[in-house]
Amino acid sequence: MIIHNLGIKDYTEIWEQMKEFTATRDSNSCDELWLLEHYPVYTQGQAGKPEHVLNPNSIKIVQSDRGGQVTYHGPGQLVAYVLMDIRRRNLGIRTLVVKLEEILISVLEHYRIPANIRSGAPGVYVGEKKVASIGLRVKNGCTYHGIALNVNMDLSPFLGINPCGFAKMEMTQMSHFHPNIQLEDVSQHFVQYFLTQFK
């Protein structure tokens, strides 16, 4: 597993790089984990419906090829893109989603933030509020896209959408529980727990 820390990047640029990586990899290519933040952007998943974008203001909307509905990415949110040959690892996509949820819960529990999952609504929650989203794409047995964990960000753009297609879905973030939390520290813990699941 190769880990890349990419800093803050434009969504469309990284999306194109993910597609190119996935299209050109072969059975000997190492899996990769890309860690980054994005400049403010709304992304629509393949199941996304226009009516879930309520008031985008000046924030760009990108129609993506990942699974799921609309979400928001912005600075202070840890994004981890999972470029993995799940066929080689004998993993089903649902199993991968469950493992990613477990990793996110482990990270949150490390900070003593009680997290849970909800049936029929992928992602991770603190109480009824969503703290992390998951959206993947599989092509030729290989995944791209990944997770987004709200660490210490401006949550107000989520008010301009129905996050993940759920009206009035409330969002939260780790800084509500730890005001001085640093994204770099959270990223390190995410990698640690990720590598315990995926060598």
From Swiss-Prot:
Enzyme class: transferase
Superkingdom to which the source organism belongs: Bacteria
Pathway, per record: Protein modification; protein lipoylation via endogenous pathway; protein N(6)-(lipoyl)lysine from octanoyl-[acyl-carrier-protein]: step 1/2
Positions annotated to bind substrate: 66-73, 133-135, 146-148
Catalyzed chemical reaction(s): octanoyl-[ACP] + L-lysyl-[protein] = N(6)-octanoyl-L-lysyl-[protein] + holo-[ACP] + H(+)
PROSITE patterns in UniProt: BPL_LPL_CATALYTIC, LIPB
Pfam short name (any one): LplA-B_cat
Family matches, as InterPro entries: aa-tRNA-synth_II/BPL/LPL, BPL_LPL_catalytic, Octanoyltransferase, Octanoyltransferase_CS
Enzyme Commission numbers on file: 2.3.1.181
GO annotation terms (biological process): protein modification process
Matching SUPFAM superfamilies: Class II aaRS and biotin synthetases
Annotated site, Lowers pKa of active site Cys, chain positions: 130
One cellular-component annotation, GO: cytoplasm
Keywords of the record: Acyltransferase, Cytoplasm, Transferase
Cellular compartments annotated: Cytoplasm
Chief location: cytoplasm
Active site per database record: 164 (acyl-thioester intermediate)
Coiled coil: none
Family per record: Belongs to the LipB family.
Additional record remark: In the reaction, the free carboxyl group of octanoic acid is attached via an amide linkage to the epsilon-amino group of a specific lysine residue of lipoyl domains of lipoate-dependent enzymes.
Function comment: Catalyzes the transfer of endogenously produced octanoic acid from octanoyl-acyl-carrier-protein onto the lipoyl domains of lipoate-dependent enzymes. Lipoyl-ACP can also act as a substrate although octanoyl-ACP is likely to be the physiological substrate.
Official protein name in the record: Octanoyltransferase
Organism encoding this protein: Legionella pneumophila (strain Paris)
Higher taxonomy: Bacteria, Pseudomonadati, Pseudomonadota, Gammaproteobacteria, Legionellales
Gene symbol of the encoding locus: lipB
